[in-house]
């Protein structure tokens, strides 16, 4: 009996974790036609209000978390500098 209760509680806890997962929103643009990019952030800690630092074609921007996957969070270990980056 105790193992059944434990299994139900474990399943409930795991489903809560999965349902609470947050993502970067899907970017509006799929490509960047500029000769530079603008990074407003390089990691989540650069953002305010618990926003995520999300990679987009024209740079990194802070966005409110989305329930739907589609965007990509910036790798905090990647080389990055805030501001305009020219190539």
Curated annotation (Swiss-Prot):
What highest taxon heads this organism's lineage? Eukaryota
- One of the record's GO molecular function terms: toxin activity
Q: Which UniProt keywords apply?
A: Antibiotic, Antimicrobial, Disulfide bond, Secreted, Signal, Toxin
Q: Which residues form the WAP domain?
A: 21-66
Example GO BP: defense response to bacterium
Q: Does the keyword Signal apply?
A: yes
Describe the PTM: Contains 5 disulfide bonds.
Q: Name one GO cellular component term.
A: extracellular region
Signal peptide extent: 1-20
| The keyword Secreted is assigned to this record | yes
Q: Which cysteines are joined by disulfide bonds?
A: 24-54, 32-58, 41-53, 42-80, 47-62
The protein's location, in the record's own words, is: Secreted
Q: In which tissues is it expressed?
A: Expressed by the venom gland.
Purpose: Has antibacterial activity.
What family, per the record?
A: Belongs to the venom protein 11 family. 01 (wap-1) subfamily.
Q: What is this protein called?
A: U14-lycotoxin-Ls1a
């Amino acid at each position: 009996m105790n193992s059944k209760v434990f299994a139900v509680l474990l399943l409930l806890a795991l489903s809560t974790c999965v349902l609470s997962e947050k993502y970067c929103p899907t970017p509006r643009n799929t490509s960047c036609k500029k000769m530079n990019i603008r990074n407003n952030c390089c990691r989540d800690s650069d953002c305010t209000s618990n926003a995520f630092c999300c990679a987009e074609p024209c740079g990194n921007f802070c966005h409110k978390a989305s329930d739907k996957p589609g965007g990509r969070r910036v790798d905090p270990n990647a080389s990055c500098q805030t501001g305009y980056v020219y190539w």
